[in-house]
Each structure stands twice: as structure tokens, then as C-alpha cells.
């Protein structure tokens, strides 16, 4: 389906409310998406965002901009979540290699090849540090979405 020549009409049964306002048709494209993302991704607080001015600049109604902003943030959160998953999977595979290496070292210690013992407290400290780093990265998607919704007051 081509977006340039496709129109969708929806007919809803019943009367329109008295205060119903027909929205003006507008065109939305990837260029406007990029402009919206650059503006909303840099705001520090909700007071910094003037939705009416932004709507006038982009030629779109305010409710659409808020919904689109939410969608853009949601997409960015998915990308971030995927990056965190990839990072944690990479770390867990490297940790499994380290555990194999530790087992080999312990076997070597038990044999007569090595005359000294490996300090196990160093290994425990390293494992605890890496697991605490992973726990700092794990933020639930719903918590990030809730924070976003609070920020945008949607």
C-alpha cells in the first residue's frame, strides 16, 4: 500500500458531540519525525516544551505530537533494551569462559604442576563487581515507560 495515494475514511454511527472540532488534515513524514525527536530528546523538563508552538512549526495537532513523542521514546527504549540484552549476553558468555578458566586453574593447583595456590578472594571480588554492574543496567521497560509518561504528562 502506497502512503502517497491512500486515504482511509472511517464512519462512526451517531451524532458528533456539540464541542467536536474537526482536525485539519496534515502531512507527516520522516523529516518531521526527525525534527520532533531532536526537539523532544533534548528537553530537561516538561515546562521547556511548548506543544502549541511545536505543533505550529510541524503543522500537526498537539494530541498527535504527544502520541508520536511517546511512540518515538518507546522505540528508543526498545533499542536501549536490546543493547542492554546484547551487553548482558556478551558478559554472561565471557563469565562462563572465566568460570571454565577458573576450573582449569583449580585443577592445575590440585596437581603437582603448580606449587602455589590461586588467591580465591580476588576471583570472588571480580565476580561480585561484574554482577553489580549488570544489576545497575537492568531497568524494567515498564519503569522507563512510566517515567516517560510522567514527564510528558500523557
Curated annotation (Swiss-Prot):
- Give GO BP annotations, semicolon-separated: autophagosome assembly; protein transport
Keyword list (alphabetical) reads: Autophagy, Protein transport, Transport
Q: Where in the cell is it found?
A: Preautophagosomal structure
Cellular-component GO terms for this entry: phagophore assembly site
The UniProt function text for this chain reads: Plays a role in autophagy. Functions at the preautophagosomal structure (PAS) in order to form normal autophagosomes under starvation conditions. Also plays a role in mitophagy and regulation of filamentous growth.
Which family does this protein fall into? Belongs to the ATG29 family.
Q: What is this protein called?
A: Autophagy-related protein 29
Query: From what organism does this protein derive?
Result: Kluyveromyces lactis (strain ATCC 8585 / CBS 2359 / DSM 70799 / NBRC 1267 / NRRL Y-1140 / WM37) (Yeast)
Its taxonomic path starts at: Eukaryota, Fungi, Dikarya, Ascomycota, Saccharomycotina
Q: Gene symbol?
A: ATG29
